[in-house]
Amino acid sequence: MSLLLRLRLAKQRGEAILSEEKLTKLAVDPFEIAARHDIIVQAKPDTASGVSGMLLRHGNSFGILYASDIPNEGFQRFSVAHELGHYFLDGHIDHVLPNDGVHASHAGFSSGDPYEQEADNFAVGLLMPAKPFRKLMGRSRLGLEDIEAARDA
């Protein structure tokens, strides 16, 4: 399967999670989705430089740590959504966490690893699902309030 198709399917899987969870409105809260799946999410201590998020595994229990040293809610939400991608996408857990341990994701660079690219595309589909965004952007008169609503979503 081509990488382009894998990325498209990852984005669609992010959107499908919203349907499965019956979440139909913006803003999407990745912290809530994690909680619904008994995934503990916490801010990461500032000890691992350049790490934006981590997926942790102990047996069948999972946790997510996200970078708190970057005080940007959108960045933090994307980091959590990215780690959820590793959790929800087929084959990711076995690839990034074949045994108990920690998988660290790094921000600020474009990874050549298709699993990281898929997790990014999953996060896009989860946080910016096409239908609600099209509906928001389809209004006849867009103004500052609409732009701010899209930003906050």
Regions found by a protein language model. Name each.
Residues 1-153:
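Active-site hotspot residues in diverse enzymes, especially metal/ion-binding acidic/histidine motifs
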